């Protein structure tokens, strides 16, 4: 496997720092320890403790938040990374693959990507995501604005983004921005958060590891079959496009390819949440362990002694009877289920990484590590199917998701007057911190966080010298991003309380 040299991928350069060099192993390790400190101490990580995993607004601390889920993903990611490196050592490939000074960074990058992987998710999880997209899609009408010429079906409600006769280049930009704003995605928001909002100045390698999908949010062309998995969701926004281009150059990544260690982070997430969602459902009394076993065995089909289901799920269930009366049988069942599952799936993920190393290294491997015809992947899929059928469709979960959708939609309605302001008026409001003719908008602006307001101001300053028509389009884009940034950064409880306060429901 010539051409595989991880020194080409594990870059310790940072976007806001001068180029640096680190020769010995400890110096290189220190660079990535700095990344760890920046990430662990960031407000985005702390906010995960009050963001939904499955059950919004949950008061039972035993039920997972995004933070506790991310800690579990971090542990599994570390395990997979160690398994891969151990196999490289056994095959005497460490030096051949350029890893002799990069063993600790290899693990650290994976661990921190696992910890960060959900930081871009809005309140109320995927329903919060859907609320943002639906709200902006209704106003942007992205499909009505495809192409470079106006269409009679165009229903865009934003004057500056409507397509105009004879303005081909501006219309292409308008269409791109309408698509971009209608494609809010947690993974893309994570890239924006660490680079544009928090300015953590992480190494390119560390950020590359959370670039899970490789399609820009504004993409409207057909997706090439060679990358239909890697491009199935937006991975970054137009606002971060230049940064992502820098990142790709620094990490030697082709346009739609992935960073190799991202596959490990993705596998760790798949392994962790498939068990966690079921355990939380038992904690919430949605079903019992016995009912869960029945659901899983029905999905598996005929169980034979010694097959993977019997070794993993059956063995954990048999342990249930032995522990009865001595300790919490439910806790013991899930401990054994987790140990058995991780013990089978982690080596399988590591083996898949190694078997497909050339494509994984280049980033063109167009599937997840845990996506094949093996029994291990079948087991993972039955966990997911049981969760979809019996957890996500449960009335309590659906009721909370509907509430979350309404909260996020309502907050967007409340803050929409800021988007309706003329560009000159909003610019004056930002500069003076008040506008006499817009008292409601002034008070809404004051509620936005300083961090998000500064990010908007910096973006507006960068585009200041553009021709006026382009400036107005980009200014609206960054203003809409400002509102998305603020609302998506809320915790579940803060969003719920803010909605009630502003609706005078208290």
UniProtKB/Swiss-Prot annotation:
Species of the source: Yersinia pseudotuberculosis serotype O:1b (strain IP 31758)
Catalytic class of the enzyme: hydrolase
Alphabetized UniProt keyword annotations: Hydrolase, Magnesium
GO terms under biological process: dGTP catabolic process
Originating gene: dgt
Coiled-coil blocks: none
MF terms in GO: dGTPase activity; magnesium ion binding
Subunit-level organization: Homotetramer.
Recorded catalytic activity of this chain's protein: dGTP + H2O = 2'-deoxyguanosine + triphosphate + H(+)
Residue ranges of domain HD in the record: 66-274
Family: Belongs to the dGTPase family. Type 1 subfamily.
PROSITE patterns per UniProt: HD (PS51831)
The name this protein goes by in its record: Deoxyguanosinetriphosphate triphosphohydrolase
Needed cofactors: Mg(2+)
InterPro entries: dGTP_triP_hydro_central_sf (IPR023293), dGTPase (IPR006261), dGTPase-like (IPR050135), dNTPase_1 (IPR020779), HD/PDEase_dom (IPR003607), HD_domain (IPR006674), PHydrolase_assoc_dom (IPR026875)
Stored SUPFAM superfamilies: HD-domain/PDEase-like (SSF109604)
Matching Pfam families: HD (PF01966), HD_assoc (PF13286)
Gene3D superfamilies assigned: Hypothetical protein af1432 (1.10.3210.10), putative deoxyguanosinetriphosphate triphosphohydrolase like domain (1.10.3410.10)
Protein's job: dGTPase preferentially hydrolyzes dGTP over the other canonical NTPs.
Top-level division of the source organism's lineage: Bacteria
HAMAP family: dGTPase_type1 (MF_00030)
């Amino acid at each position: 496997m010539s051409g595989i040299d991880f020194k080409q991928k594990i870059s310790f350069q940072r976007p806001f720092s001068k180029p640096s060099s680190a020769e010995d192993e400890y110096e290189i390790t220190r660079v990535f320890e700095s990344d760890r400190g920046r990430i662990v101490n960031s407000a985005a990580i702390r906010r995960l403790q009050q963001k939904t995993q499955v059950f919004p607004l949950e008061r039972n601390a035993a039920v997972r938040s995004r933070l506790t889920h991310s800690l579990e993903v971090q542990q599994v990611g570390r395990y997979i990374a160690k398994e891969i490196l151990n196999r490289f050592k056994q095959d005497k490939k460490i030096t051949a693959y350029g890893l002799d000074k990069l063993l600790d960074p290899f693990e650290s990058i994976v661990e921190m990507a696992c910890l960060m992987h959900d930081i871009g998710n809005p309140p109320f999880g995927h329903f919060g995501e859907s609320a943002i997209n639906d709200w902006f899609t209704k106003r942007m009408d992205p499909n009505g604005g495809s192409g470079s010429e106006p269409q009679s079906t165009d229903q865009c409600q934003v004057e500056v983004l409507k397509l105009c006769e004879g303005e081909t280049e501006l219309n292409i930009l308008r269409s791109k921005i309408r698509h971009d704003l209608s494609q809010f995605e947690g993974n893309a928001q994570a890239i924006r958060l660490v680079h544009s909002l928090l300015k953590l100045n992480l190494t390119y390698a560390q950020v590359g590891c959370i670039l899970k999908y490789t399609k820009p949010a504004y993409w409207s062309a057909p997706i090439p079959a060679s990358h239909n998995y890697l491009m199935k969701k937006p991975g970054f926004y137009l606002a971060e496009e230049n940064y992502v281009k820098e990142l790709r150059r620094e990490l030697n990544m082709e346009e739609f390819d992935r960073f190799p260690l991202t596959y490990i982070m993705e596998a760790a997430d798949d392994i962790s949440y498939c068990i966690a969602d079921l355990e939380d459902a038992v904690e919430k009394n949605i079903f019992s362990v016995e009912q869960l076993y029945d659901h899983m065995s029905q999905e598996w089909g005929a169980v034979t002694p010694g097959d993977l289901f019997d070794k993993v799920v059956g063995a954990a269930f048999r342990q249930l009877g032995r522990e009865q009366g001595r300790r919490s049988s439910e806790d013991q069942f899930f401990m054994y289920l987790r140990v058995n599952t991780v013990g089978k799936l982690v080596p399988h993920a590591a083996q898949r990484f190694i078997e497909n190393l050339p494509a994984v290294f280049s980033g063109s491997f167009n599937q997840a590590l845990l996506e094949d015809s093996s029994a291990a992947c079948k087991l993972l899929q039955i966990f997911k199917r049981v969760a979809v059928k019996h957890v996500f469709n449960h009335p309590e979960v659906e009721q909370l998701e509907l509430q979350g959708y309404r909260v996020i939609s309502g907050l967007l309605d409340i803050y929409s007057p800021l988007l309706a302001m003329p560009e000159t008026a909003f610019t004056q409001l930002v500069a003076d911190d008040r506008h006499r003719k817009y008292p409601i908008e002034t008070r809404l602006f004051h509620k936005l966080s300083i961090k998000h307001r500064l990010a908007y101001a910096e973006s507006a300053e960068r585009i200041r010298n553009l021709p006026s028509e382009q400036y107005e389009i980009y200014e609206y884009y960054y203003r809409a991003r400002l509102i998305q940034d603020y609302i998506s950064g809320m915790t579940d409880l803060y969003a719920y309380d803010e909605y009630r306060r502003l609706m005078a429901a208290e």
